[in-house]
Design a protein with these regions (language model features):
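Gram-negative bacterial Sec-dependent N-terminal signal peptides
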Residues: 2-22
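Generic detector of short, well-ordered, non-transmembrane alpha-helical segments enriched
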Residues: 16-18, 48, 393
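N-terminal helix-rich structural modules
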Residues: 23-222, 227
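Short charge-dense sequence patches
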Residues: 33-39, 67-77, 110-116, 129-143, ...
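Short His/Asp/Glu-rich catalytic/ion-coordination signatures at enzyme active sites or charged loops
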Residues: 36-51, 100-119, 141-184, 245-284, ...
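Active-site-proximal, well-structured secondary-structure segments within enzyme catalytic domains
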Residues: 159, 188-191, 198, 202-245, ...
Length: 472
């Protein structure tokens, strides 16, 4: 080997050693016994995109080993060695997936989308392997068949029944051929759900209305106009432009107050037709979802997907669910008709020369309210600033339930807009961590919801894990 080749080989070895050392030095927070933070809140600033997939793969491997230990256990299946053991399995996977799921919906990015696309089929396949495992299901069924003769508590019996039902609904009773078909359908659905949500978020962020004539802003509150001006600046537009988006704080005031009817129509149609055409058209995706769901229902012995979904809830069948909806729908339609009649009368009185259309509803509802009750919602708005509302809710919680919410300004948070609270019981002991994240942004899906970033449990050995809840 000549000197150049020897030098090149040495460089390659050195580079490889350096990379290996760097990988070894890199600590994956998800794979540590504890995060080392207050109440074990995820250390968001220390979590890298590169941490998720290795942690998920290791979590899946750990869960598979834990499930295999249940399967090979020669002891007679009982609640502890089967049902409880399954519930305790996969805690590493749950740990990382809860954080990933939370951030994917509240602080999305192209990197998170790429990770989601890679892990979704892996998670789907791994779950199916467990739920359709005949040896594991045999143990579950053994406990289920003897549940009333084992001295179990009512809660334990319910747990056994729910577990058995979950396995059956996941395909545990199917033939090998149908199991294989169901696995394919589940993989397809996981991809379709990803595509649907990706299109929805992309279409929401792509839509905007640019106004460059201040006359078109007539009727809008100053706060709404200022917000639109800020949005225009963020979009790189010069002064004298205003940008309105589909995010609720931008969309709703426009529909409610804008005197420009064409502006209201444009916003309304943009919202109701979201992701219905163009680059982010969800029409074909929805069509594929409907067909895949129908196939899944048929494999599991149901006439349609609605029957599959309602069979395990209080309604029990689609007819009962529809009947409940109609009990609300019919009087609601009647009331809306009465409201629209009032709106039309007011429009006629003002000489508007229009027939009330859907994009007029919020606007004329506000006009009727002012006309009938002299109530200006924009004047009331000042009393309902987010900090005031949050403080009021916390005060009510303390008076009703004795719990206190104490802000933790130094606690880890996944976005600067997030506030973190220590939830204390009446005796001052720690109950939970509560995070609030109430403002819209391009990286967050629309809507309002809550979820757990960390679940709660009490193990038989007395180990307690308190929940970390986020409210969006």
């Amino acid at each position: 080997m000549n000197m150049k080749k020897m030098a090149l080989a040495a460089c390659i070895v050195a580079a490889g050693s350096f990379a290996a050392s760097a990988d070894q030095a890199r600590v994956n927070p998800f794979l540590q016994p504890s995060y080392g933070t207050v109440y074990d809140i995820p250390p968001f600033e220390s979590i890298s995109y590169d941490d998720y997939i290795p942690a998920i793969r290791q979590g899946i491997a750990e869960r598979e080993a834990e499930i295999q230990a249940i399967i090979v256990n020669r002891a007679t299946p009982d609640f502890d060695n089967t049902i409880l053991a399954m519930e305790k399995a996969g805690r590493t996977l749950s740990r990382v997936m809860r954080v990933f799921g939370a951030l994917n919906e509240t602080d999305n990015s192209p990197e998170m989308e790429a990770i989601n696309a890679e892990i979704s089929p892996i998670i789907s396949a791994a779950s199916d392997e467990i739920m359709m495992n005949p040896q594991l299901f045999a143990k579950v069924k053994s406990v289920y068949d003897r549940r009333n003769d084992m001295g179990l508590s009512p809660a334990q019996i319910k747990d056994v029944e729910d577990t058995y039902t979950e396995f059956v609904r996941a395909g545990a009773l199917l033939s090998d051929t149908d199991k294989a078909a169901l696995k394919e359908v589940n993989l397809k659905l996981s991809d379709l759900y990803l595509a649907f949500n990706r299109n929805l978020l992309s279409a929401t962020n792509a839509f905007r209305i640019v106004v460059n004539d201040p006359k078109r802003l007539s009727g809008l509150p100053e706060s709404s106009v200022a917000q639109a001006a800020d949005a225009a600046r963020e979009a790189g537009l010069p002064e004298g432009n205003w940008v309105f988006t589909l995010q609720a704080p931008s969309r709703l005031p426009l529909l409610q107050y804008a005197d420009d009817r064409e502006l209201r129509r444009e916003m309304y149609e943009g919202y109701v037709n979201l992701a219905s055409s163009g680059e982010y058209n969800n029409g074909p995706v929805i069509n594929d979802i409907v067909h895949a769901r129908a196939r899944k229902a048929a494999l599991l012995g149901y006439p349609d997907y609605a029957s599959y979904m309602t069979a395990n809830v209080m309604a029990k069948n689609p007819a009962a669910a529809e009947d409940l909806l109609m009990q609300i729908w019919r009087p609601a339609v009647k009331r809306v008709g009465e409201e629209v009649a009032e709106m039309q009368a007011l429009a006629d009185k003002e000489g508007a020369g229009i027939t009330i259309a859907p994009h007029d509803y919020y606007y004329y509802a506000e006009k009727v309210r002012r006309d009938k009750y002299a109530l200006d919602e924009d004047e009331v708005r000042a009393y309902f600033a987010i900090d005031n509302v949050r403080k009021g809710i916390f005060t009510m919680a303390e008076k009703l339930y004795g719990v206190k919410f104490v802000e933790m300004p130094e606690a880890p948070k996944y976005h600067p807009e997030v506030k973190v609270y220590d939830v204390l019981d009446t005796d001052g002991s720690h109950l939970a961590v509560f995070m609030t994240d109430y403002f819209p942004r391009a990286s967050k899906r629309q809507g309002a919801w809550m979820d757990e970033m960390q679940g709660s449990f009490v193990d038989p050995d007395g180990t307690v894990q308190r929940p970390i809840v986020f409210n969006v």
